[in-house]
Amino acid sequence: MQIRHFLQFKDFDRLEFEYLFDRTRWIKNEFKQYRRYWPLTDRTLAMIFEKHSTRTRLSFEAGMHQLGGSAIYLSTRDTQLGRGEPVEDAARVISRMVDIITIRTHEHQIIERFAENSRVPVINGLTDEYHPCQILADIFTFIEHRGSITGKTITWIGDSNNVCNTWLQAAEIFDFNVHVSTPPGYEVEPERAGLYGTDHYEQFVSPHDAVKDADLVTTDVWTSMGFEDELDTRKNDFADFCVDAEMMACAKKEALFMHCLPAHRGEEVDAEVIDGPQSVVWDEAENRLHTQKALMEYLLLGRISVR
C-alpha cells in the first residue's frame, strides 16, 4: 500500500474525508457501547512533540491504545532532534522502528522534510501554519449537530493562525464559506489567501458583520505558543474581538460555537458563550479522539468495510 501522510487538510479529497467521517461514526459508536475494536494490534505510534499539548497527546495516545496498539511519547529532550540531529536522519531511523508517527512542531517545513524521508505515515499534530486534525474533528462535530457543512458560513474571529489557515483549506474541499475578522495587522496573509482562492473566503473589519447569518462561530486564543512575548500587545489589539452573547446574537439563531481549546474566558470568549447552549466545544474536543482513530486506521490499513 502506498504511504500516505496527513500534513495539510488538502492532502485528502472530499471522498476520503466522507469515508473518514463514516468510519468515525462507527468507531465512536463502538467506543460508546464498550465494544472492543483492535484493528491496530501490535502497531506502534511515535509522538514527537516540540510543542506542549494536552488534547493532541491524549487523543492520539488513548486512541492508539483503544485500537489495540501502543504509543511512545518523545519530546525534543528525549531525542537527538533537540540536539541538532538532521530531521532527515531522525526520520530514516524512527520510521524503521514504528508504524506511524505524529509530529507537533513549529515550522511546517520540518514535518515536510520528515515525511519525505519516512517509511511510514506521518500526521501533522500541529505546526505554526496548519492544524488539520483539529479541523477534521470540527467538521465532523458540525455534521453531527447540523448535517452537511456544504454551503454553510463559518466565521473565524481573532488571530489568523494555523487553525484559521486550515479552515480556509477545508472550505475549498467542502464548498462552504469562511468569514474572517481580525484586528488590523493580523489578517490572513495575501499570499496564503491566494493559495485557497477567494470564492470561499471573505475578510471583515467588524466582527459583528463577520458573524451575520453564520452557521458556526469559532475562535482561538489571542496569543498562540511562540508569541508569548506579544501577550500584552495582543490583549490590547484584540480587545474588541471577544465572542460574547451580543456577537452570537448576530449569527443565525441555531448557530454553533466552537473553540479548539485551551480557552481563556473573558478574553477571546465569554463564559456565557463557551458554557452556553450554542457551544459544542466539549463534543468537539472528544471528537479529536474518534476522528484521529479513523485517520490512523485509514493511513495504516486503507479502506476497510468493518460494520
From Swiss-Prot:
PROSITE patterns: CARBAMOYLTRANSFERASE (PS00097). Its EC number is 2.1.3.3. GO terms for biological process: arginine biosynthetic process via ornithine; citrulline biosynthetic process; L-arginine biosynthetic process. Carbamoyl phosphate binds at residues 53-56, 80, 104, 131-134, 260-261, 288. It comes from the Bacteria. L-ornithine binds at residues 162, 220, 224-225. It holds the Pfam family OTCace_N. One of its GO terms (molecular function) is ornithine carbamoyltransferase activity. It is an enzyme of class 2 (transferase). Reversibly catalyzes the transfer of the carbamoyl group from carbamoyl phosphate (CP) to the N(epsilon) atom of ornithine (ORN) to produce L-citrulline. NCBIfam families: orni_carb_tr, PRK00779.1. Belongs to the aspartate/ornithine carbamoyltransferase superfamily. OTCase family. This is Ornithine carbamoyltransferase. It comes from Nitrosomonas eutropha (strain DSM 101675 / C91 / Nm57).
